[in-house]
């Protein structure tokens, strides 16, 4: 499949963030439209789908893949790109429109959480080359490789990040779910 040069492949993660953050997609889409951005978007369906969708976009020739979500969605998108069959993966730009809870990656790069700034940065081709590391591990069934941008969690961190997303939120406070999650066997 051939994609017109400059067209973005956008992955919207509706599970990222709070309900207020989840409702921002309409505003983000309207802002991109008002700026004349050429894009196709797909919505993730659940755990693991961001990775799969990013791989599909990379394999279909998108050279700019934008994630509307948080740190978890960004990490999954990086894994999808790196695990894809796309040629010249190092030339694929990944953009982030912060729309999650932590957004640590965006904060690290001094991107405020206002989506307009993020869209404008991507439009203006504001890029930084970053290292992508990887970790090989055995998950109890098979050997795996996971990629990560500039930071990695190990031990209870990744497990405790995953559990709240799999459970219903209570009063929109992930902290309560996180505390309960840490007492589950790993």
Predicted regions and their residues:
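Short, glycine/acidic-enriched loop or turn micro-motifs at the edges of active sites
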Residues: 16, 74, 101
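ATP/NTP phosphate-donor binding region
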Residues: 1-68, 79
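Alpha-helix boundary/capping detector
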Residues: 58-59, 76, 83, 186
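Short beta->alpha linker loops
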Residues: 45-48, 69-72, 100, 155
């Amino acid at each position: 499949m051939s994609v017109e040069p400059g067209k973005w492949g956008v992955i919207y993660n509706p599970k990222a963030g709070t309900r207020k953050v989840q409702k921002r997609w309409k505003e983000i889409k309207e802002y991109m439209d008002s700026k004349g951005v050429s894009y196709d978007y797909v919505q993730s369906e659940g755990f693991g789908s961001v990775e799969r969708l990013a791989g599909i976009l990379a394999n279909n020739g998108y050279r700019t893949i934008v994630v509307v979500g948080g740190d978890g969605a960004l990490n999954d998108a990086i894994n999808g790109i790196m695990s894809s069959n796309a040629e010249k993966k190092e030339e694929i730009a990944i953009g982030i429109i912060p729309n999650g809870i932590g957004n640590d990656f965006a904060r690290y790069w001094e991107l405020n959480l206002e989506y307009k700034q993020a869209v404008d940065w991507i439009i203006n081709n504001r890029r930084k080359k970053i290292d992508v590391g990887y970790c090989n591990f055995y998950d109890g069934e098979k050997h795996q490789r996971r990629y990560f941008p500039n930071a990695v969690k190990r031990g209870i961190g990744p497990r405790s990040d995953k559990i709240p997303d799999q459970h219903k939120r209570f009063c929109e406070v992930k902290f309560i779910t996180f505390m309960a999650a840490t007492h589950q066997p790993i």
